[in-house]
Regions:
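Charge-rich, low-aromatic oligomerization/scaffolding segments with amphipathic character
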Residues: 21, 62-76, 164-177
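A cross-kingdom feature marking solvent-exposed beta-strand/loop segments within repeated
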Residues: 31-51, 140-149, 153-154
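Short amphipathic alpha-helix segments
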Residues: 17-34, 125-139
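A common structural junction motif
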Residues: 27-31, 72-81, 138-139, 173-182
Length: 194
């Protein structure tokens, strides 16, 4: 591919942004030239439009880049999102099942393009507890691990397996984050405190 044109995109969630870039590679003849999280998250941005993430799509023509940007925007606005684990929205998580990866996340995970993926992110403690539950609930494997703290003070992993197993992992992860939010101090059966 002869790269002649580029398009820039930002949003208030880096993980939604990465998912959107991957979607763009499925819908248009583009590649991801750059993708990076901003430190401390969108709520702590130092300018109005800084967002939490910056992505750059590259393509051969303006039309291809525009098509990729539109696909990314649709993903951001209509599909991928963080969810609240409690009533005051102070604990959020991202548990998104991707039925088939594009070139971007496939390369990042070193898996074949078109593989199912469970994209799991939460605050530090919640992410590690919930990741354990997700791995026990489904036949999936870790293909990328984000040990906390990430640049945005979260953690999690990308898991691959069958589409149904990836969905089961997402569901288990979500339930576990919600459980921690509802019971932040709990003694487990082995006596350890979470």
């Amino acid at each position: 591919m002869c790269i002649r044109d580029r398009g820039l995109i930002t949003c208030d969630s880096d993980d939604v942004g990465y998912t959107a870039l991957d979607e763009a590679t499925k819908k248009a003849c583009v590649s991801v030239a750059y993708a990076q999280s901003m430190y401390a998250g969108a709520a702590n941005a130092n300018t109005a439009l800084a967002g939490e993430f910056l992505g750059i799509l590259a393509g051969e023509t303006p039309a291809e880049v525009e098509s990729g940007l539109l696909a990314a925007r649709r993903m951001i606005e209509q599909e991928a999102s963080f969810y609240s684990a409690n009533d005051d929205d102070s604990i959020v998580y991202f548990a998104h099942c991707i039925s088939r990866t594009g070139s971007y996340l496939s390369a990042a995970c070193e898996i074949p393009e078109g593989s199912p993926l469970a994209y799991l992110i939460a605050p530090p403690l919640e992410s590690m507890y919930a990741l354990d539950k997700a791995l026990k609930a489904a036949q999936v494997r870790v293909c990328a691990f984000y040990g906390p703290p990430s640049p945005t003070n979260f953690g999690g992993a990308l898991l691959t397996g069958s589409q149904s197993d990836c969905q089961a992992a997402c569901d288990a992860f979500a339930r576990a984050v919600i459980d921690v939010a509802a019971n932040p101090i709990e003694t487990l059966s082995d006596g350890a405190s979470s």
